[in-house]
C-alpha cells in the first residue's frame, strides 16, 4: 500500500529537489567552458522599410552561467518553501489547492530556459529575446490566475486557455529557426538542437497537462497534493534534461 502524500513528505521532497538542483548548478559551473552566445540588435540606416545597418553585438550570454541560473533559481525556491519561515504558508496553500511560490519561480526559471533554447536555435535579436521571455512569463502567470480564481472541478478554464495561447507562441517562433523556414538551402540546425526543442517542448506541455488533470479532477489527480509532487518531479527532470543536453553539446571544454 502506498504511503499517503503529506505536507511533511512534500517538505522532504522539496529539500531533496533543492539539493539535486544545487548540485547540478555547481557541477555545471565547475565543468563548463566559457562558451557564450551573442545578443544582437539591428538598427535602421535610413527611412523605415529601406536599409538596415549590420547587426551589432550588444553583449554575449555565458551559456554555462545561464544554465546555472535556472538551476539555482529552482534550488532557491525549493529551499524557501521548505524553510521554517515559509513552510507554514506553503503547506496552507497546498491545503487550499494553490501554490503561488511555484508560479513565481516558474515565471522566471522557465523563461530563462526558453530564452536559452531560442539562443541555441539561432535567435539573437534583443527584441525577440525580451519578447520570448515576456510571453513565456505571461503563460506561467495565467497558470497562477487559474489557481487564484478557479477551483478544481468548477468548470472555469479561461486563465488556462489564455495561458495555452500565450505558451505556444515561443514554440511557433522557434519552429522558423529550427527548420530554417524561408532560409537558404544550406542552413540547418544541428541534430542536438532538434533533440533539445522536442524534449523541452514535451516537458513544457506536461506541466499544462498536470493542471488540466487537476482541474478536471481525473482519477488520482483529484488529489491536489499529488499534482504538487508531480510538478516538483517534472521541474527537476525538465531542468536537468536541458542543462545536460546543453552541457554535452556546447559546454564541454575542448
Walk through the language-model features, giving the residues of each.
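Polytopic alpha-helical membrane-helix bundles and their juxtamembrane interface segments
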Residues: 2-99, 110-254
